[in-house]
Amino acid sequence: MSGEPTFHELGARTNFSFLEGAAPAEEMIVFAKKAGLSGLGVADRNSVAGVVRAHAKAKVEDYPFQPGARLVFADATPDILAYPKNRRGWGHLCRLLSVGNLRAKKGDCTLYLADLLEWQEDLLLIVMPGEGRPQPEILEALLEKLKASAGNRLYLGLAPRYDSFDRHDFAVLATVARSLDVRLLATNDALYHDPHYRPLADVVTAIREHVPIASAGFLLQKNAERHLKGPKEMVRLFRDYPEAIVNANKFFKRLSFSLDELSHQYPDENAEGETPAESLRRLVAEGALERYPSGVPEKVTRQIEYELELIHDKKYEPYFLTVHKLVKFARSVNILCQGRGSAANSSVCFCLGITDVDPQKFTLLFDRFLSRDRDEPPDIDVDFEHERREEVIQYIYRTYGKEHAGLTAAVISYRSRSAGREVAKAFGLSEDVQSALVSSVWGWGTSPFTEEQAKGAGLDMADPLTRRVLAYASLLMNFPRHLSQHVGGFVITRDRLDEVVPIMNTAMPDRYMIEWDKDDLDQLKILKVDVLALGMLTCLARAFRFLEVHYGKPKTLAELYEDQQAAVYDMICRADTVGVFQIESRAQMSMLPRLRPREMYDLVIEVAIVRPGPIQGNMVHPYLKRREAQRKGEPVDYPSPELKAVLERTLGVPLFQEQAMQIAITAAGFSPSEADRLRRAMATFKRTGTIHTFERKMIDGMVRNGYEREFAERCFNQIKGFGEYGFPESHAASFASLVYASSWFKAYYPDIFCAALLNSQPMGFYAPAQLVRDAREHGVRILPVDVNHSDWDALLEGEAMFRKEAIDPRHGEMRDVIRSGKAVRLGFRLVKGLRQPDMEALVARRGEGYRSVHDLWLRSGLTRAVLERLADADAFRSIGLDRRRALWAVKALNEQSAVERLPLFDGAGSTDLQVEPAVALPDMAAGEHVIHDYRYLTLSLKAHPVSFMRGDFARMGILSSRDLARTPAGRRVTVAGLVLVRQRPGSANGVIFMTIEDETGVANIIVWEKTFQKYRPQVMGSRLVKVRGRLQSESGVIHVVAEYMEDMTPMLGLLRNEARRFGANDRADEALRPTADARDKKALRQLRPAPPAQEGLETSEAGSAVAEVMPKGRNFH
């Protein structure tokens, strides 16, 4: 074997050379090893985003790997491969890439040769000659300049192009190299690993160049040779230049850097004169006295000491101090925030005020958060108000600077929809076929395309082109498209961050991110803190302000937590939870009447139980069964007193990851660290299968401790059923307090709750239309957007505006509970196309109110386009104009007559200058109003679209959603409504839960997998759908189990047809036989008698136009 050739490939690109490389980094490593390459260097285009993945895979494979980057310049300098010789060289490479990133827009890197000359120390460089014929003069000048700085760290690459010119080109390059004493280096400049991936390389080229493959011509690779080649083949190819092979091997051996050398130090946050450990201990002691004003329990003191010792051993004090500093800042400026996730297992975090869940109350497990034997950094997630989180982010940048703080990247990858569309486009399929193909895909998953989806899109599976499109779309899935900023993961360092990883601009101003995602950071053991945004915290912060300002009742989250009210739980048990945090989905609403929460811990269970883990572990029904038995006074049997202590709070059924760990510790003799490894194996067993390594140890351990083998096996299988979906109790406990707080506001102050929710959009499960409908059903009066009354946000106004008799009978129990007294005035934020600064100017200059459109135009300084949008939104009712007349008045404004806005005319009353058009405009029909409401506001206070079809529906035997409550279970029924929500939980075996809405309320639809496959276009594409099926009722929750579905979207045309029957038209500047103002010549030209309604007008034609403004329905997993 000693005679076998060796070769190290240094020119490999991965799919992190976005739309250039055509193979994942991990597959490149595996293939390189299999091909017999002695080592692999990865050098992606101006990036090191993919090197951690290659590094991690190389460690698993025990394979030599080196990270580098392919430097692509903006000044016509040929590409140069740069590899760090050592840790200092890595820092220089990161600084170099950061320079290019920060001078360019997000996603670009603009480098010049001068940048490389500044940062070339400790970098080994390979000049690549490029795709065309070598240009000796240019290469000589470049090499001379580089050699003066880099010396013997400089090489000239030889890369065959397999185009019959290689012999000539190599000779030219060799002559240049010899003349300058620069060494040649062999590489195949690989774009992918396997030659079979060449067609995929063509696909990504076509996507990158925005041309179909058939038209790409010379943009495509000439052959399939740009793959990883083994040593024998490379030696054969470079037989005339054996020194190039030798130099590649020597080059690789000169590289001593490993990504494992990267160390991360959090900034020193300790007070002057204290070590970080002393500062943390002092802050925890002070916080403990605040958390336990009656004295810190001995058990808590012991736990705090245990945690502090472990934190000290791991040297994590600066990390905790940094997170504490961020939370302290947020609270100092009244930003609502709360830690969650595994950090809620920590008493230290609780005492520091980072989390609000007392681990002692919930019997949480610290080792779930931080373990002595687990060489992994802790992960603290903190939620902030989503509209004010930017203040925290900018505080971080102000405090530490972009050289020391950056957001984590998120790798945006191709999913089924994007891959399907892009590949179909690359193969030249029409836009219609592309849209049909992607519309057959559920959500944003990465499941391969099926034959049914292709047929549904009108594709012929017998056609080889169709099969290629589906095959390459499936291959493209999970390929990275680009880097985006993580939702809030921050890396903060004491040393320069841009010497650890390149930093780059984001699409948002004054934000910077790094090139690695959270998995990369975990792999390298680099700590991050998650500064996350939570819409419900924004909603609650606004609700607390409303409560104090309008009702004189200041409250806090902590006070609500202690104010446990039976009326709130009664409402929850009735599943009256639209808008409530975490329990507003159909699946949660179905569970609430069965679980019937009566205390805070019940909400902890409710949050966690409707999750894939407990469902797949077959834990839901046993838990509900035992809960019902408990209500009847029946005792719960436990296998042992020890396990009773672990499982008593969940009635003997393990629902949480922490319980799985505690069972392993208590019943099987696991150490806390072993139990944590079990938890991690549970989280990844579908991908790695490692949970089985714990099976014998756990079962045998339980048997040794006196448990029956059958019980031990059942217990392990139940834990295994958690899979990767097990829900941590600490996470559920953190969320439960927000569930109760949002429920409290909904129960007692639905006016506040509605306004706060509207002002916190986008968030939650339901659109504003459904939030408004629900508030009205609870007796809240909703007032329309108006130029004289609205603000940007929704407001509360009026006194004694609440009417108990307006409460829908379905919510009659709330009549003596609700304390509301205000009406909700909708805000300008709901109007599509309006800008907040414009509306703030309108409000600021409103004074006593605007008397006319002309008055508003003069005083507000807004453009006519903004006024048109206000008229579109029907916002001029307070001055006596509906949207048609308001639009006409806006059209009559002469934008050129800006002289009327000059100070000279300030003394004149607005009516002196106003000349309203004298025109007889017909009233706009109700259906047309509703269309415009949905077009510009996404909701209507005037009528529900389905109300215009009720007569037709009644003749078709279609029931209203209200009728379902009066229909016996088991009967076959037909319902129809607008599609609001489609939910397809990953644990539901393909079942889809749909929510549809008519003018009387919502109906819940269950679509089994078989039915979904039969009616996929109707489920996925309908905006108005008819469903026939059997009525199912359980614990007060009503569903229709779909058997037949029909797309009724064309019937939405009835709204427009209804308007046309009365001679109404689409635009307000069109009228029947109008008298126009002679000032407006353009308006005169536009005025024409409306054509008579066509006989036999197709409903589908009008329906397709109206459907565009109706909600598409939201898809959730």
From Swiss-Prot:
Protein's name according to its UniProt entry: Error-prone DNA polymerase
Reactions performed catalytically: DNA(n) + a 2'-deoxyribonucleoside 5'-triphosphate = DNA(n+1) + diphosphate
Origin organism lineage: Bacteria, Pseudomonadati, Pseudomonadota, Alphaproteobacteria, Hyphomicrobiales
InterPro entries noted in UniProt: DNA_pol3_alpha_NTPase_dom (IPR011708), DNA_pol3_finger (IPR040982), DnaE2 (IPR023073), DnaE2/DnaE/PolC (IPR004805), DNAPol_HHH (IPR029460), NA-bd_OB_tRNA (IPR004365), PHP_dom (IPR004013), Pol/His_phosphatase_N (IPR003141)
Primary location recorded for the protein, binned into one broad class: cytoplasm
Domain of life (superkingdom): Bacteria
Entry EC number(s): 2.7.7.7
Coiled coil segments of this chain: none
Region annotated Disordered, chain positions: 1086-1117
One Pfam family in the UniProt entry: DNA_pol3_finger
